[in-house]
Amino acid sequence: MSKKIYCIASFEAKEGLNEELFKALQSLEPQTIREDGCIQYIVTKHITHPNATGKSFPIVFNEIWESKEAFELHCNKPYIKEFFHKHCVLEDGFVKDFNVCVYSDE
């Protein structure tokens, strides 16, 4: 087994702001993918499929990090903290609700 960390960060935009939120999240990709320990960092949109009928927020980040330490460093980067404050905390942000979960394969 590895010490990789798998993060699923899902977001629900406020009414009418889905595309704006998606673009704001996409803007985080180029800088994050260059971080030490980042293996994968991809923002995705929910699609419908007859073999996948579960419920989810419409926008999801799929992240893989080399270690817990690499993930923690990422979470403490100023641009990540700024995104969460601007869009998840402040009233005029794009995010209605969000959920961040981390997993290990150990």
What residue spans do the PLM features occupy?
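An amphipathic, aromatic/His-enriched active-site/gating alpha helix that lines ligand/cofactor pockets
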Residues: 27-39, 64-100
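Glycine-rich beta-strand-turn "strand-cap" elements at beta-sheet edges
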Residues: 2-3, 42-54, 83-106
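Short amphipathic alpha-helical coupling segments at ligand-binding clamshell hinges
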Residues: 20-24
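Short, surface-exposed ligand-recognition loops at beta-strand->loop->(often short) alpha-helix junctions
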Residues: 13-18
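Short, glycine- and small/hydrophobic-rich beta-strand elements in well-ordered beta-sheets
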Residues: 30-60
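Active-site-flanking beta-strand signature of metal-NTP-handling nucleotidyl enzymes
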Residues: 5-11
